[in-house]
Curated annotation (Swiss-Prot):
Glycan-bearing residues: N232, N241, N461, N511, N669
Cleaved signal peptide residues: 1-18
Organism of origin: Candida albicans (strain SC5314 / ATCC MYA-2876) (Yeast)
Lineage: Eukaryota, Fungi, Dikarya, Ascomycota, Saccharomycotina
Keywords annotated in UniProt: Cell membrane, Glycoprotein, GPI-anchor, Lipoprotein, Membrane, Signal
Keyword Isomerase: no
Subcellular location: Cell membrane
Protein name: Putative uncharacterized protein
Residue ranges of the propeptide: 720-741
Length: 741
């Protein structure tokens, strides 16, 4: 009797494939639950198992029970429960929407109850323990318990050869079978339905037809097309290249290659289409409900994955910096799902913190559980049931961009996600290649390396998605080096041979820096004169003996007139520094190599500003007077100012030298002149003896290189006999100066 039930299911499975029928499923509290219609009150429930199959009409956006005109909806006025209605007039006009495998109702739905089966309501008012349910998933094949026992056929055994058949397992539907149990699916021969299967081998074509009820067994024929499904492994279909599968029985029609062309062609096309669809879906294995969402597609969340998205107009990959999920900084992040936890780079776990930031934690129990990744996107089971696919956004940080869950935090949203499986060894090879390529700064263009064609074919057939390409905009290299720019004209063209060996070796030879001084440009400009006058004044009170009256008087000890005449010289020196030698060795084969040496030079232009400042000081003699006294002979003093443009030696042989006398010859014993500090660190020597009128000239060099001025005062004249300039003094003053010397 079990055999008849299984065959009935197979007939139903064929009808489902032919008419796009499906079951409806969701996940609540990490359990797969299916839409089930209560046969008593026609209410729609969510239960662990169901045989109800549905179909969707895109033109009317209605969900029908398969093979009937009964629709699934609710009555807005008197029945808030989701039910099956045979008469559309007694139901609401709300419909459904189907996007790929995502099924949504046009009104919010709630599931109520403490445990399955749950009731589905559009209005939970007055009901307890209700939670909102957003979306459903469609399952293209119904759920079937695996049969592991041998079932014997109730009837007489035929004397002829017995047919050996196997039942094919669903390739994309999660089952309740324990993970450690191995299930052996096989080719199925149906009763009362003529089927045709054609091998995809290009050399031969085999047609299998049967109209009898075969004996069921779990034995696998050695030459038959077999499909093996194991937990945590991808399904692989193996086809025999030499022999074909033939099922024969006593009452069956003859199985030959001479079937009618019309039926053979039609059935072959249908079968090949079905086989191709099954092979496309076979890359995803059935996983536990906690770790796998709706089945189907090419993404396997239990093996390494990389995730990319569009960000600011560019496709970027998810990275990690050992603390957070990031963009454009850190290392490439590979993801896996283990028991609903999202693992990163095999050593970290993703946790959504209170700020909704994707942070990385060391312990699995501290991470967020409920992640589901498949072809339809990234999902997070929150509050115990499915929600829409989650969205992500990125906010700028000091070290780059950090990824947040959701878009309500004001960050820039990410979209157009792509998820690709990648092998661990391919990740290692990719990282090694990236490191090698970033270390090389110069390489010779040559033919690309090719691998064995057989290995390439096997890799393309076994299929996992290719690793992300090394696009600088997508995956920035973690290693940076200083690259020397080489003129393309310096590269030597090497003709490739039949088996070229492209070996580029770059070495930096330590060498002393070579400095070459180039052109020197000097520009001199004169500035205007700057004059400063400094007076030293003292007040003296004279009192006579026996007289109480005292007379105050003012004495000008000295007057210093300082004149600056700066001359600025601008000098530009071009210096060429050779500080790097690069040797590039290119080998055509093991014996022929060529070495090319490149010298990298740096040109430095040094600008020096030099200021030649001629400082002339005029020191006057002391004068006495009352409180209103002023400098005597001020015009005479001004006439004695020496400028750099004038160079007149004093005339000591003048006939009037003996006749002219100074205004005050006697020294002022009460007055002592203090040393005078000259600006710009200049040094002036002024006698503190009987002070007379004198002139001191000092030359100051101020050299400025870059932004750091250097002041170096250089006294030019040591005494009055070496003064450079023009001195206009009376004969008596000149005689006194000569006597002092």
């Amino acid at each position: 009797m079990k055999t008849i039930s299984i065959l009935a299911f197979l007939v139903l499975a064929r009808l489902i494939e032919a008419n796009d029928l499906f079951q409806v499923k969701t996940i609540i509290d990490y359990q797969d639950l299916y839409l089930h219609i209560n046969p008593n009150n026609f209410q729609v429930k969510l239960s662990h198992s169901s045989t109800d199959v549905f179909e969707f009409d895109e033109s009317s956006n209605k969900l029908f029970c398969a093979g009937t005109n009964d629709i699934i909806t609710y009555n807005k006025e008197n029945c808030p429960y989701l039910m099956k209605f045979a008469d559309e007039s007694s139901s609401s006009v709300l419909g459904w929407s189907l996007d790929r495998q995502t099924l949504r109702f046009d009104h919010d739905l709630y599931f109520c109850g403490t445990k399955p089966p749950y009731s589905l309501l559009a209005d939970p008012s007055g009901s307890a323990n209700c939670r909102k349910l957003n979306i459903f998933r469609t399952v293209l094949e119904p759920k079937v318990e695996k049969e592991e026992e041998e079932e014997e056929y109730d009837g007489e055994e035929d004397d002829d050869d017995e047919s050996l058949t196997e039942f094919e397992s669903s390739t994309d539907f999660p089952t309740m079978t324990d993970e450690s149990t191995e299930v052996e699916p096989s080719t199925t021969t149906e009763s009362a339905i003529s089927t045709t299967e054609t091998s995809k081998d290009e050399e031969s074509s085999t047609t299998v037809e049967s109209t009898t009820t075969p004996k069921t067994t779990t034995t696998t024929s050695a030459d038959s097309v077999t499909t093996t499904s194991k937990s945590n492994e991808s399904l692989t279909t193996t086809e025999s290249n030499e022999s074909s599968t033939t099922t024969e029985s006593k009452d069956s029609s003859t199985t030959t290659d001479e079937s009618t062309p019309e039926s053979s062609t039609t059935e072959t096309d249908k079968t090949e289409t079905t086989i191709e669809e099954q092979e496309e879906e076979s890359t995803t294995s059935s996983q536990s409900e906690e770790t796998e969402g709706p089945s189907g597609g090419n993404v396997d969340s239990t093996v390494a994955m990389v995730i990319s998205a569009m960000f600011q107009g560019d496709r970027v990959y998810f990275y990690s910096d050992d603390k957070y999920i990031t963009l454009l900084n850190g290392d490439l992040a590979t993801f896996k799902i283990d028991d609903g936890y999202l693992q990163v780079n095999n050593n970290k776990w993703v946790n959504v913190n209170i700020e909704r930031l994707l942070e990385l934690v060391d312990n699995q129990e501290d991470a967020t559980q409920g992640w589901i990744i498949n072809d339809e996107g990234i999902f997070l089971v929150q509050d115990g049931f499915y929600s829409d696919s989650v969205s992500f956004s990125a906010c700028g940080h000091d070290s780059g961009y950090r990824v947040y869950l959701g878009e309500e935090n004001g960050c820039e949203p990410l979209n157009q996600f792509r998820i690709m499986n990648i092998e661990e060894d391919e990740i290692d090879e990719t990282e090694t290649t990236e490191s090698t390529k970033t270390t090389e700064t110069t390489k010779t263009t040559g033919p690309a390396e090719t691998t064995d064609s057989a290995e390439s074919t096997d890799d393309s057939n076994e299929s996992s998605a290719p690793p992300p390409t090394e696009d600088p905009s997508d995956i920035p290299s973690a290693t940076t080096t200083d690259e020397a720019t080489v003129d393309p004209s310096d590269e030597q063209s090497i003709a490739p041979t039949s088996e070229p060996i492209d070996e580029s070796t770059e070495s930096e030879e330590p060498n002393e820096s070579v400095t070459v001084t180039g052109d020197t440009t000097t520009d001199t400009s004169e500035q205007g004169l700057t004059t400063f006058t400094t007076e030293t004044t003292a007040t003296v009170t004279d009192c006579e003996d026996g007289d109480d009256s005292c007379t105050p008087r003012t004495t000008i000890r000295s007057t210093v007139i300082t004149t600056h005449c700066p001359i600025v010289t601008k000098t530009e020196v071009e210096t060429i520094v050779t500080d790097l030698t690069i040797t590039l060795t290119t080998c055509i084969d093991e014996t022929i190599c060529e070495a090319t040496t490149f010298v990298v030079s740096t040109t430095v232009v040094t600008t020096t500003l030099t200021t030649h400042s001629v400082v002339t000081e005029y020191v006057s003699s002391a004068h006495e007077g009352d409180g209103s006294s002023t400098i005597a002979n001020e015009d005479k003093h001004n006439d004695a100012i020496v400028t750099p443009q004038e160079t007149v030696a004093p005339d000591t042989n003048s006939p009037d030298a003996d006749q002219e006398q100074p205004d005050s010859v006697e020294p002022d014993n009460e007055t002592t002149d203090a040393p005078i500090n000259v600006e710009d660190d200049a040094t002036a020597l002024i006698s503190d003896e009987d002070t007379t009128t004198s002139t001191i000239t000092t030359l100051i060099y101020i050299t400025q290189s870059g932004d750091q001025p250097i002041k170096t005062p250089v006294p030019i004249f040591d005494n009055a006999a070496n003064l450079a300039g023009s001195i206009s003094l009376s004969s008596g003053v000149l005689l006194l100066i000569l006597m002092l010397i």
